[in-house]
Amino acid sequence: PLLKTRAWHDPALMATDQSALSGLRALGFPETAITLIGTNNSYGNNLADTSLMSLYRVMGEFGRLSGPALAVREATQGNMRLPEAMAGQLARPVEMGEPVTAVHQSSSETRVTLASGKVLNADAVIMTLPLPALQQIDMDLPRARANLLGEVDYHKVIQLHCIVEAPFWENAGWGGSWWTDSLLGRIFTRPIPGTARYNMTVWINGDDCDELNILNETACTDTISRALWDLMPDAREVTSVGQLVRWSNDPHAGGAWALWRPGQAATAHPALRAPAGRVFFAGEHTAESYRGMEGAMESGERAALEVMRLLA
């Protein structure tokens, strides 16, 4: 039903939106198939809360980003190098380790208070934080706007990053990546450029993260590692466990990306991207055309133009 890129949150379409669970059942899918479809769902923590229109949006985006005329490109040594390079072009360095506790404004300026007690004055502020982190900052938002920050779900993701010294999967005729219906979710392996080693990432999605998120870091890492060795015993001798990342437990994130419940985006999306006086909002949750890093950059351009219009 999405004939235009930005139509996914159109109120008329949102009025007929439903959960992926309801949609699949209406189409006659058996429960066993629905359970399988819901495994490793990246677009909702469970199918009952997954917007069917959001899935159409994802399909449309994949269509725009693929095709014979489009080349697949990667950032050398990881995606983080891209924002680092952008930061390197700024006139002033990015200040790290300075959490913001409050943003207040008058008719002529904004005042940003840091955890250290330092206060910054500016003509305008662009807030790009994920909504769970934004909730922790005192901004004197209208009550309805402040309440909305806590009403949008964020995707639960746990990642265990490992280093593999040798491609153990080749002897078994495997391809090196796995899609499972077990605790492990999905497993991705990628060669490390210039070496014979591989990065391996265990990627667990949605409500399957709940039982792991209540464990301490050591117990969580051990639980995932044991499941990994049980699935692929040959991996144990050549695989070292590196970093555990639990997005929902990170106070500066609260989850991997924003999720829209059925029908929610019709009103919530435009409300969250609207400026509040001299405070402007960006981040992937405010983007219209794209998701992820592309959406974050799209939203940054939009917010910058909004500030320029204010200050013109």
What name fits each language-model region?
Residues 21, 25, 83-87, 101, ...:
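Non-transmembrane alpha-helical segments in soluble domains
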Residues 2-99, 106-107, 128, 138, ...:
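Active-site/ligand-binding neighborhood in enzyme catalytic cores
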Residues 30-38, 167-173, 237:
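A short alpha-helix-loop-beta-strand transition element characteristic
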Residues 109, 156, 172-312:
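Conserved flavin/dinucleotide-binding core of flavoenzymes
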Residues 9, 13, 71-79, 118, ...:
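Aromatic-acidic/polar surface patches that form glycan- and anion
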Residues 98-107, 114-174, 235:
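Central helical "cap/lid" subdomain
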Residues 54-63, 119, 157-159, 199:
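Intrinsic-disorder/low-complexity, polar/charged segments enriched in Ser/Thr/Lys/Arg/Asp/Glu/Gln
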